[in-house]
């Protein structure tokens, strides 16, 4: 799904002490079938090699924008990312997570098909040995369900796509 008319999605990744996992996260995001997105990486004062990894990815792909700030916690990093975001839609991904290649495509399509302001997806836990613990099966196509705001009040920051004007501050 790569059309110039597709709206820009801002993917915000707060980064702190995840040197071991960060490349997997970034590779999964840059492999998305939905191509019109910016990837905002916010280094929250990480003392390991995360900043160098972020610089390498930014040098290789113009969609990657990197920022460095004093440690203030994950909420502070997310808020900083929101201030920098230019997209019509906002998505958060934790830096020790990875996503399926059609993640952004499916989330955006679900929002458009149902005319909603928020799309939320499930996830699978993966052990340290990278074996799926399987709380949700992999799918070839997403299953779309519609919930009221009251039914899904506690939507997590990760695993969701929402319009920028509805992006909550933390």
Residue ranges and their predicted role:
Residues 1-170:
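Nucleotide-sugar donor-binding/catalytic module of glycosyltransferases
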